[in-house]
Amino acid sequence: MFGRLVVHTVVVLAVVMTLSAAGSGRQQAAAVSVCSGRPAKTVLFATGELRIHKTRQYVCALAVARKPGARREMSVSLQPRGGHAAVDRGRFTRQAGPVTVHALNRCVRVSGAIAGHSASTGWILC
């Protein structure tokens, strides 16, 4: 009787540990890269960073807070040269974005702000 209880407990613990490890791996993978493509540029500023990713046809950007937690004003703007800007603005806990634009053979300009501090790139990826 006691042996069956121990075996049952060990099996349940093994299943729980396996499921929790698999779940945390998915969360880490999602946090690593929200945008598709290769990392093209990272711009650091006081309260966070702008992350810019590029594929052949598209550019994607997001503003990530250095210390996630409380909701605060965040924004990210991505504009292809000669086109309209894609903007994500609001009160977020971790990041603003991602925003994506079609930028095949075009320069882009990226700007972002978190809690009153901002950064911008000028025209890049030309």
Model-predicted regions and their roles:
Residues 26-126:
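Post-signal peptide N-terminal regions of Sec-secreted extracellular proteins
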Residues 1-27:
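Secretory targeting and sorting signals
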